[in-house]
């Protein structure tokens, strides 16, 4: 990452020279700065979600500040700092959400080719690139069976390179992105993939790659795409770890489709995620599974500033074990069967008070606990199969 930042700084130094040479306007005239903040209150009938939600949790806060600066017609610098508090998973420490140089290599009326260098948001699915901005999400929470908050950072961004191409024809637009680099790893990785906080740390095993292909009709009324990321994680055990040095291989891919009109939007996505654990030792035997998730979602704008949301989603820790029985048996009954799946109905309301302020309300009916974080729910005996969630959120932007 240090080398990427040096490259970005070098490009920034080149930019002012080009701008002054053109003698037209100051480099800083194109600077844009924006920000947002949101606060939510979350209540659940059972189980912990974004904090101590059975007692009502206020531990979901987002504060972001972003800026963009065109150095010259071919180079755009942009970045965002984000402070995000999400229950026990994220503590609100400000972090670099993204910071990159977008370099156009070739451009015409029919196509554009370029490369993004730095910490780049992964273009996975419909919502991953904009998931941290409350105003661009369809609800307070994204579909958790695909956009996991319990392990958000791993799929969120990459420190590396993203090459992209866009082609514009009479029938619409076609875009392709190819990239690779280092994912962002935090403590939630261990809690999710090893189901505990073992002594040791994860590192990437130099096998990270990303691809995205999108097609959209003119006006983007209809669009569909395929996107995926492949990575290998290596666990380096600490002195007191009962595990050996093992690897977890991940192939996370999404098929997406969306139809948009003036008053309503229909979206559907399908996730498949093959996983393989190897060489962790007898406490965590070698194992392979394929996670599966999908949702169907509709939003309807009854007024320009009022929007209704309805969504149904399902997710499974093993697509061949949809009732979770084999999952529970494999762990000796430590995990209840319903920890292997989630089936969720969601209804929501959005009200844009004005351009700066928005409020939301959302209700969810859950069957299963697959989407929950083990970090927030370490006592598996306290988990309940059926539970409700109600949340409200206020958001501001400038």
What are these regions (language model features)?
Residues 1-24, 139:
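Cleavable N-terminal export/targeting peptides
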Residues 13-54, 126, 337, 353-357, ...:
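Outer-membrane beta-barrel biogenesis signature
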Residues 24-33, 40-43, 54-186, 207, ...:
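Outer membrane beta-barrel
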Residues 51-52, 100-103, 225-398:
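Outer-membrane beta-barrel pore domains
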Residues 55-56, 151-154, 201-204, 245-247, ...:
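Short Gly/Pro-enriched turn/cap motifs at secondary-structure boundaries
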Residues 128-131, 189-191, 321-323, 373:
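Short aromatic-enriched loop/helix-cap "lid" or pocket-rim segments at secondary-structure transitions
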Residues 173-177, 187-192, 237-238, 280:
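A short secondary-structure junction signal
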Residues 192-237:
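Loop-centered beta-sheet repeat module
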């Amino acid at each position: 990452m240090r080398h990427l930042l040096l490259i970005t700084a070098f490009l920034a130094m080149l930019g002012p020279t080009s701008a002054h040479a053109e003698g037209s306007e100051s480099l800083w005239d194109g600077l844009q700065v924006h920000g947002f903040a949101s606060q939510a209150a979350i209540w659940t009938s059972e189980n912990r979600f974004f904090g101590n939600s059975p007692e009502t949790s206020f531990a979901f806060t987002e504060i972001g500040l972003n800026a963009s600066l065109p150095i010259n017609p071919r180079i755009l610098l942009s970045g965002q700092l984000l402070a995000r508090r999400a229950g026990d998973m994220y503590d609100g420490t400000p972090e670099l959400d993204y910071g990159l140089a977008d370099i156009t290599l070739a451009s015409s009326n029919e196509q554009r080719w370029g490369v993004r260098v730095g910490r780049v948001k992964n273009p996975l699915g419909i919502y991953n690139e904009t998931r941290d901005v409350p105003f661009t999400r369809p609800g307070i929470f994204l579909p958790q069976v695909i956009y996991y908050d319990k392990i958000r950072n791993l799929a969120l961004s990459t420190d590396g390179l993203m090459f992209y191409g866009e082609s514009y024809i009479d029938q619409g637009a076609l875009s392709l992105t190819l990239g690779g680099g280092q994912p962002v790893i935090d403590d939630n990785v261990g809690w999710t993939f090893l189901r505990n906080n073992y002594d040791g740390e994860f590192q990437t095993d130099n096998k990270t790659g990303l691809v995205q292909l999108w097609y959209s009709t003119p006006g983007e009324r209809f669009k569909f795409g395929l996107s995926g990321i492949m990575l290998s994680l290596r666990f380096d055990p600490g002195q007191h770890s009962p595990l050996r040095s093992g690897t977890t291989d991940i192939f996370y891919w999404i098929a997406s489709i969306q139809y948009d009109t003036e008053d309503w939007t229909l979206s559907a996505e399908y996730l498949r995620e093959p996983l393989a654990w190897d060489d962790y030792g007898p406490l965590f035997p070698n194992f392979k599974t394929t996670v599966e998730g999908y949702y169907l979602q509709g939003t309807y704008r009854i007024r320009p500033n009022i929007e209704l949301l309805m969504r149904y989603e399902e997710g499974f820790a093993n697509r061949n074990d949809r009732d979770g029985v084999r999952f529970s048996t494999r762990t000796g009954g430590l995990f209840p069967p319903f920890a292997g799946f989630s089936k969720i109905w969601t209804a929501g309301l959005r009200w844009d008070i004005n351009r700066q302020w928005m409020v939301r309300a959302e209700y969810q009916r859950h069957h299963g606990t697959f989407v929950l974080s083990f970090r927030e729910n370490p006592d598996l005996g306290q988990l309940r199969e059926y539970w409700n969630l109600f949340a409200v959120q206020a958001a501001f932007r400038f």
